[in-house]
């Protein structure tokens, strides 16, 4: 089983779209889309990881 991951190399970004493609973080928080999630990953210095796609 491959680990679930998202490429956040292009982040952080100053603004995210309102696109609704939820991701569940390792903090058990649902992020609205990849942009919101990746900005949080950068802020966490890489401690936040993707738990799974979809709502937590």
UniProtKB/Swiss-Prot annotation:
**Keyword Cell inner membrane set for record:** no
Listed A to Z, the keywords are: Disulfide bond, Glycoprotein, Protease inhibitor, Repeat, Secreted, Serine protease inhibitor
Signal peptide segment: none
* Record-linked Pfam families: Kazal_1
Cellular compartment(s): Secreted
Q: Which residues are glycosylated?
A: 45
Q: What InterPro entries has UniProt attached to this entry?
A: Bifunctional_prot_inhibitor, Kazal_dom, Kazal_dom_sf, Prot_inh_Kazal-m
Q: According to UniProt, where does the site described as Reactive bond 3 lie?
A: 18-19
Q: Which Cys pairs are S-S linked? A: 8-38, 16-35, 24-56
Q: Tell me the SUPFAM superfamilies matching this sequence.
A: Kazal-type serine protease inhibitors
Which residue ranges does the record assign to the Kazal-like domain? 6-56
**The keyword Glycoprotein appears for this protein:** yes
An example of a Gene Ontology cellular component annotation for this protein is:
extracellular space
Write one Gene Ontology MF term.
serine-type endopeptidase inhibitor activity
Domain topic, free-text comment: Avian ovomucoid consists of three homologous, tandem Kazal family inhibitory domains.
Can you name this protein? Ovomucoid
Protein source organism: Pavo cristatus
